[in-house]
Amino acid sequence: MTRPLCAPKAQLTGIKAVLFDAYGTLFDVYSVALLAEQLFPGQGQSLSILWRDKQIEYSRLLTASRKGPQREPLYQPFWEITRAGLRYACKRLQLNLSSELEERLMNQYRHLSAFPENREVLQALRDRGLRTGILSNGDPAMLDVAVKSAGLGELLDHVISVDSVRKYKTDPEAYALGERATGLPASQIAFVSSNAWDALAATWYGYATIWVNRQNIPFEELGTEPAYTGSTLRAALDALSPA
């Protein structure tokens, strides 16, 4: 019998804080497709998908690579690689991206739509005495605008950017920021992400990981699975429900 792709597992215990990935988990990275479709009819969805894929590819490439004889680390702020990903995607799709259109799309990315269940879930977690926060590849300025636009500021104890270590997820130093900010060991922190690669790496790091499988797709086939899986952010409530 085939196991359901969003089958949950046992509830998590001993959790004192819940950290969320931002882009794709709290904020809908594909909501930019509506504007993209208006600007480039028939190409909006393709552009938004390729843009996101390239953004993530660039983050991994920079973190994994070293430059020159001294093997110097490479880093560019997430805003810059987001712009680079947009430019690449438009070239790949043979779309004429003027400076004006670029700024319109980048501004839309700055104000991505939040998923509707965000406030309910964050408030419920705080009502249970759990600390909440974001652990994201986004740079501080991006996260500040996104959080304020969504009205989530008062529901978050921590907004953590990997910019402080200049390394992107899935580097362990990026995930270590969660322990540093909360003062808790990874085993007492639930990490919530809709990105399977992120959930996998966070599990390897030691977090109790909740995967939000919004697209009902298989998890990565590398021998490790998240502690809990659901189809919306409410999976965090289900995973951490009182016994």
Can you say where each PLM-predicted feature lies in the sequence?
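Asp-based, Mg2+/Mn2+-dependent phosphohydrolase catalytic module
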Residues: 2-15, 123, 135, 139-140, ...
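Active-site neighborhood of HAD-like aspartate-dependent phosphohydrolases
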Residues: 6-56
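Hydrophobic side chains within well-formed alpha-helices
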Residues: 32, 47, 101, 152-155
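Alpha-helical elements of Rossmann-like donor-binding domains used by nucleotide-donor carbohydrate transfer enzymes
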Residues: 34-35, 50, 84-88, 104, ...
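Hydrophobic alpha-helical core bundles mediating ligand binding, dimerization, or RNAP-core interactions
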Residues: 36, 51-55, 82, 105-109, ...
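Short helix-capping segments at alpha-helix termini
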Residues: 40-44, 92-97, 151-155, 183-184
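A metal-dependent, Asp-based hydrolase signature
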Residues: 45, 53, 58-103
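Short, acidic loop-to-helix structural element flanking the phosphoryl-transfer center
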Residues: 75, 79-80, 95-133, 144, ...
